[in-house]
Amino acid sequence: MNDRLRRLIADEIDCCDAEEIDQCRRANVEERLNVLQDLKADTKDRIHDEDLRAVSKLGNETRYTIIRLLVAADKDLCVCELEPLLDVSVSALSHALSDLSSAGLVDRQKRGRWRFYQPTERVRALVNAIDATRR
């Protein structure tokens, strides 16, 4: 990593004369490494397992479609209402909903023998962020 970083900095440096350039490069590499280490520490504090689980669950077409349907419906939906909208088995649909629930992306409520699902505020915010950044 340091060799590549040194080459990058060498390409960026044009302020030094030939005698000072090596010293300037070394100083800039150390400074840049310190900045990058600070960035790594700041980022590490913001990475949470629950965030990774939530984002990874959206990476599946069936689960993402379910989320889109629930957000668009703006009300809770039963599995029997979602089933005709998706090209998957009831078992696969139930499994996907269970995954979404365990990741905190949908809330599940049992009413009698029926289970209803609704999107959480967190997943609504994620969908809104995706929509807002689409080109």
Model segments located where?
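N-terminal helix-turn-helix DNA-binding core of bacterial DNA-binding proteins
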Residues: 46-88, 117
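Beta-hairpin "wing" of winged helix-turn-helix
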Residues: 102-111, 118
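Alpha-helical hinge/cap motifs
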Residues: 59-63, 112, 123
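N-terminal leader segment of winged-helix/HTH proteins
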Residues: 1-58
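Alpha-helical residues within the helix-turn-helix
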Residues: 84, 101-102
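Short, hydrophobic-biased segments on the C-terminal half of alpha helices
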Residues: 97-98
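Conserved segment of winged-helix/HTH DNA-binding domains
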Residues: 116-135
